[in-house]
């Protein structure tokens, strides 16, 4: 299955969505696709006063595709006998604001999805890696994040030059971040941010293999 974690479009005035739609159409005709929003999709939908009707038209078109759109939804599926719960988080916009980290992300997750079922593998699509500690505390087995696009220029495996909220050298631009049996995987992504620049920052497609163990613990390697 294919998990799409958002920012398939670039949310700016006059943005076009045809390429994003074409990509999702081709992908969903071949694979089962689960698609959660990034902040770019979220803002073109929530702010028509800035972006016009492009967000509304984009969402209507995507709804016609053979994929599952996860806007604060969770679905249960089974793959090769392994029970999975896939959650797509679209948080309150304040969690994308610049400045200090906002309180209440765990409560946001509980409000949207309840508590993770310990008898299932819970996969969380949560675009913003700044709240990785909260995702780990909530208890998702694996959380997929992006948002930083590798921080423009990568400095090692995790640290980038700058984040979208203008923090210098953030430590969550890539890599795997673990806590016990839980992991957050941050991808540098396939595209660019609003400014199309990548330095020592190759495009990244994450492939995850989940194997069932008898005790149902699912370590990420």
Residues of each region from the PLM?
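Solvent-exposed loop/turn segments at secondary-structure junctions
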Residues: 8-11, 39-43, 75-77, 91-94, ...
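Short, conserved loop/helix-junction motifs that constitute active-site signature segments
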Residues: 24-30, 116, 136-139
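Conserved beta-sheet core of the metallophosphoesterase superfamily
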Residues: 123, 128-206, 215
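Beta-strand-turn-beta hairpins that frame and shape the catalytic cleft
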Residues: 67-68, 74-87, 178-184, 210, ...
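Membrane-embedded segments
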Residues: 1-68
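Acidic/histidine-rich helix-loop elements
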Residues: 8-16, 42-53, 94-103, 157-169, ...
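Active-site neighborhood of phospho(di)ester-bond hydrolases with catalytic His/Asp-centered motifs
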Residues: 1-7, 32-39, 70-73, 123-126, ...
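Binuclear metal-dependent hydrolase catalytic cores centered on His/Asp/Glu-rich metal-binding motifs
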Residues: 45-67, 79-122, 132-133, 198
């Amino acid at each position: 299955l294919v998990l799409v974690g958002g920012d398939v479009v670039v949310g700016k005035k006059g943005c076009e969505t045809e390429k994003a739609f074409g990509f999702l159409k081709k992908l969903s005709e071949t694979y089962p696709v689960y698609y959660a929003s990034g902040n770019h999709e979220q803002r073109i939908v929530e702010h028509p006063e800035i972006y016009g009707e492009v967000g509304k038209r984009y969402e209507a078109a995507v709804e016609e595709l053979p994929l599952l759109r996860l806007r604060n939804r969770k679905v249960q599926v089974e793959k090769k006998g392994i029970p999975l719960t896939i959650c797509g988080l679209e948080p309150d916009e304040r969690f994308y604001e610049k400045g200090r980290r906002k309180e209440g992300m765990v409560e946001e997750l509980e409000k949207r999805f309840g508590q993770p079922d310990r008898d299932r593998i819970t996969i969380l699509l949560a675009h913003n890696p700044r709240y990785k500690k909260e995702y780990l505390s909530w208890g998702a087995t694996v959380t997929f994040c992006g948002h930083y696009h590798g921080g423009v220029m990568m400095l090692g495996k995790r640290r980038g030059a700058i984040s979208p909220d203008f923090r210098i050298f953030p430590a969550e631009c890539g890599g795997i971040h673990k806590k016990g049996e839980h992991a957050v995987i941050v991808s540098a992504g396939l595209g660019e941010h609003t400014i199309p620049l990548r330095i020592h920052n190759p495009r990244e497609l994450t492939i995850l293999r989940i194997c069932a163990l008898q005790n149902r613990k699912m370590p990420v390697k």
